[in-house]
Amino acid sequence: MIWGFVFFAVLTSFWVCWLTIRMAHQLKFGGDESSGVQKFHDHWVPRLGGIPIFISFFSGLLLLSWGMHDGEQTFANVILCTLPAFGIGLLEDITRRAGVLPRLVMTMVAAGLGWWLLDAGLHRLDIPGVDTLLAMWPLFALVLTLVAAGGVAHAINIIDGYNGLSGFFVIVVLASLAVVASQVGDVLVMQIALISAASVLGFLVWNFPFGRIFMGDAGAYLLGFVIAELAMMLVVRNPEVSPWCPLLLVMYPVWETLFSVFRRALRSLAQIGQPDALHLHQLIYRRLMKRYGSSKDPHHRLMRNSFTSLYLWALAVFCAVPAMLFWNNTPALMGFSFLFAISYVILYRRLIQFRMPRFMVLKPSASKRLHTSKRTRSSSK
């Protein structure tokens, strides 16, 4: 039964994306310019992908709730809780004037609503001492919940830099949450996760590999918040699920964010909140995408952009597989989280030092090198 609603959400997202792209180009509205330290495209692209994702998410849950006796109010509450995060993200996409702090604050407001309406909170981490504090001090648990939800949403926004990167990552996380929810019999969380993933899938068709539309802040904050809420709901509603299962699922963007704060703080405390071009995905773009070199050709830049995402997709799968296999085994999940963090640091260090294994570098084919060589010789005559 659920798969019919999933298909509906995919189609809705796909066609609303098509309509959004057409209208945005006609009106020259809501676009992302190609200049900036974190820009890796060379033409005007609408960054309004959050609109079709939200419409598909909203309509999918609304349709699913019809005729249901259980869960209808929860669906309505989930949609209500997403509005602050989605709204502030959309404001940034349209005006480019909503700063980082207002976005974090509004996402925390959304998390506060989730605490109240959905009982979605961090009540345990399976860490001795910390769990005692969470049980004794509800205010501490609330603050930690707000920070966690805002942090995950912001982390998803940070990795939204290349075609298909954040879209594929979000689908993997939501699908993994749905798998774990189905194993523990939590139908409601499974349904919301599948509808959310379907809403992103319809968008991803337009976003990867040609980058016709970007997710934007509205999409990133919406989906990051939904992931955070579903993760907390899954753990709260099912005590057998380890809280480290969803943490491992979002380990890549969360660790990316924490590591970025750390490396910026080493340079200067004043630069912690300043954007730069030293995120892992940006280093991969510059140092592993040798197939098209430094070509300014639009097609070559597009392919470099899209191929970059393939490397990061592997990180998503690397975390998702053990999270689904060991969803109730906290020591194993902690071990894989630690392994990911160490692997990330090693990979980042080797990229900085230009010491990556040759098999990881996407080099130009022999025919392309020959063509480039001939073109160089002809231009020198």
Regions found by a protein language model. Name each.
Residues 57, 303-323:
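Hydrophobic membrane-spanning alpha-helices of multi-pass integral membrane proteins
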Residues 375-381:
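Cytosolic C-terminal regulatory domains/tails of membrane transporters and channels
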